[in-house]
């Protein structure tokens, strides 16, 4: 019996000794480890009570922290005067070991003298860094990270292989040339648009520099990436065949010459304009609702001597109303070849149509009774019948040789048409036969 009591006593002594060590560590004053302006900011946010004394136990409870590098500090006891100060170092931030969410906001040109090793934040779930110069980012130790946003930071390299819990990634406005996401199968949203070198244009007048993007293989998963934004880059290829759960894609303003979407049957919204694509087949995308695919080889970015209306073939999905909302609602086909222009009556559920600059002489919209927004500017249309378009409220007819337009059956509130001087120029060039355009507007228009 005495032996048992002795063993229990020794165990209790061991626990007590360990607690003493922890308490000793928690009571350590680390104020001198912090940058003075960072301490001032923490004091102003009431995270610490005294800038001369910061105990680990004082900040261990902090799980959510948002810091701005610019702060206003009161100069007198009456709080009547404040001055602006800049945090130039994040020294000391590493002592916030319990952080689950961290947001850092700078002023675009901010270059901080000391940036913590983010891998030390083992509990971190969300990390957001905005406008802070950060060419490299090591988050390999943040195994629980689910949301990462690093925008306008001049980031030129990032390794996400160990961040397999990542669900949302936003690296907008950085300098990434390659991005490998093959290990990140939990991703749902990927935003990597506008990777560029400031002030420099690449071949073709484009600014984007991201030339390689590897997406995870989600074919065997019940979920996967549903939103992909990679516009304004330098991509010549984009493989989305292993991403069957994609619902929204914006890959506009790249250098794509082809885009295969037959494996993306959940696709609802696609913007692939301003690439170099000659053929597009969306027959397998029966749930498509919003499509923007014009400007292929757009005049401003075309290669010298090439036709800038590169899209010669366009196959749209067959329209089946009430199939999970799967009918085309918005279509933008600016500057495409005449042979690629679809028959609009085949898409009766359209609400928005942009067919500008397509050399059209006539346009039949009699079947499009749901149409609300129409842009048919810069065409050769001299007559336009809108009697069936009773829901139309926005119309753009700039640079069209119309003489009379009856809008009395529509709900038009916004009309864009030529000024007198522009029509005068059109008459001189023989493009328009008369100076005036007569508009018959609906009752109550003002």
Predicted segments, located by residue:
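Sec-dependent N-terminal signal peptides
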Residues: 4-13
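Asparagine/serine/threonine-enriched low-complexity, disordered tracts
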Residues: 142, 163, 174, 184, ...
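N-terminal capping/linker segments that flank leucine-rich repeat
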Residues: 14-108, 117-122, 126-128, 143, ...
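Conserved hydrophobic beta-strand positions in leucine-rich repeat
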Residues: 65-71, 80, 102-105, 125-129, ...
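Consensus "Asn ladder" position of solenoid repeat domains
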Residues: 107, 132, 153, 174, ...
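Leucine-rich repeat
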Residues: 110, 135, 156, 177, ...
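Acidic/polar low-complexity surface segments
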Residues: 194-208, 217-220, 224, 295-306, ...
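Canonical leucine-rich repeat
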Residues: 90-93, 112-118, 137-139, 158-160, ...
């Amino acid at each position: 019996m005495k032996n048992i009591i002795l063993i229990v006593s020794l165990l209790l002594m061991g626990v007590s000794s360990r607690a003493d060590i922890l308490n000793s560590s928690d009571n350590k004053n680390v104020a001198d480890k912090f940058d003075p302006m960072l301490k001032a900011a923490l004091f102003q946010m009431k995270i610490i009570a005294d800038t001369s004394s910061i105990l680990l136990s004082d900040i261990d409870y902090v799980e959510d922290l948002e810091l701005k590098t610019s702060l206003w500090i009161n100069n007198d006891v009456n709080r009547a005067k404040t001055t602006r100060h800049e945090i130039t170092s994040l020294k000391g931030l590493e002592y916030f070991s319990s952080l689950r969410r961290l947001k850092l906001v700078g002023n675009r040109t901010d270059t901080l003298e000391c940036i913590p090793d983010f891998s030390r934040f083992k509990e971190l779930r969300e990390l957001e860094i905005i406008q802070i110069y950060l060419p490299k980012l090591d988050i390999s130790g943040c195994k629980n990270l689910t949301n990462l946003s690093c925008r306008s930071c001049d980031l030129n390299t990032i390794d996400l292989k160990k961040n397999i819990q990542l669900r949302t990634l936003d690296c907008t406005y950085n300098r990434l040339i390659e991005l490998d996401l093959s290990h990140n199968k939990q991703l749902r949203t990927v935003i990597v648009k506008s990777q560029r070198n400031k002030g420099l244009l690449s071949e073709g007048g484009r600014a984007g520099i991201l030339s390689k993007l590897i997406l995870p293989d989600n074919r065997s998963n019940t979920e996967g990436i549903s939103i992909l934004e990679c516009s304004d880059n330098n991509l010549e290829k984009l493989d989305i065949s292993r991403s069957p759960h994609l619902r929204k894609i914006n890959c506009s303003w790249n250098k794509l010459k082809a885009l295969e979407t037959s494996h993306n049957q959940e696709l609802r919204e696609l913007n692939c304009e301003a690439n170099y694509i000659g053929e597009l087949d969306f027959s397998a995308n029966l749930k498509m609702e919003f499509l923007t695919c014009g400007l292929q080889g757009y005049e401003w970015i075309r290669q010298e001597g090439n036709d800038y209306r590169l899209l010669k073939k366009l196959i749209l999905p067959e329209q089946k109303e009430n199939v999970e909302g799967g009918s085309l609602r918005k279509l933008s086909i600016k500057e495409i070849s005449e042979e690629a222009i679809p028959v609009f009556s085949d898409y009766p559920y359209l609400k928005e149509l942009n067919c500008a600059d397509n050399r059209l002489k006539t346009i039949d919209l009699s079947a499009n009774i749901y149409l609300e927004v129409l842009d048919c500017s810069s065409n050769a249309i001299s007559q336009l019948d809108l009697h069936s378009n009773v829901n139309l409220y926005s119309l753009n007819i700039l640079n069209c040789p119309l003489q009379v337009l009856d809008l009395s059956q529509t709900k038009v509130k916004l009309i864009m048409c030529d000024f007198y001087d522009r029509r005068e120029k059109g008459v001189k060039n023989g493009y328009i036969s008369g100076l005036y355009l007569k508009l018959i507007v609906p009752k109550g228009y003002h």
